[in-house]
Amino acid sequence: MVDHYQVLGVTRNATKKEVKDAFRRLAIKYHPDKHAQSPEHVRHNATVRFKLVSEAYEVLNDDLKRASYNAGSDSDCFRRTSGSYSNPYGNRGGRAQGSGYGYGYGYSTRNRQASSFSSGFDSTFRYLTTRAFLLNLALAGGLYFAFTAIDTSGETLWKMRNSGKSFEEAMESIEKSKSHKDEG
């Protein structure tokens, strides 16, 4: 994990102004347009560092993102101080597999396709277990039960009061009685 404070060269308690000043200084230093005429490896390193600086600024300049980053990075303290060195820029001298960049975000299309099913399943499962979905499901179940109970009780009441007759037969007898009244 890249330490955004290290990337910008500021302390953890740096103000927004200090973060902004550090970003501007490093953005000018590593901007890809400034290195357009440089050799390939210099351009590549400048582009990678510019992206890291931009990402660090985006996180540290927003109060919510910064608080979230600080909370997450405090729990990663053991990983950062474990004694093994990791290159904060992630480039390993070549390009990352499957992407056009060399800053560690490479992926192969086979892995992406294989994980698309599981991520689709995960997102569907997360949606199905949200409180709003479960409340809507309970409401729909309650309405279904109520309508079924009303329909069943209506049929039961009809059969109790009109034994041996169906609704259609009752309607026919009403029609016959109306026609007898009209004739007579």
Curated annotation (Swiss-Prot):
Cell wall biogenesis/degradation is among the record's keywords: no
Q: What is the protein's membrane topology class?
A: Single-pass membrane protein
Keyword presence, Membrane: yes
Belongs to which family? Belongs to the DnaJ family. C/III subfamily.
Transmembrane regions:
133-150
The leader peptide range reads: none
Which is one Gene Ontology cellular component term of this protein? membrane
Gene3D superfamilies, sorted: DnaJ domain (1.10.287.110)
Name used for this protein in its record? Chaperone protein dnaJ 72
Q: What is its main location?
A: membrane
- Annotated compartments: Membrane
Q: Which domain of life is it from?
A: Eukaryota
Keywords, ordered alphabetically: Chaperone, Membrane, Transmembrane, Transmembrane helix
Q: Which gene encodes it?
A: ATJ72
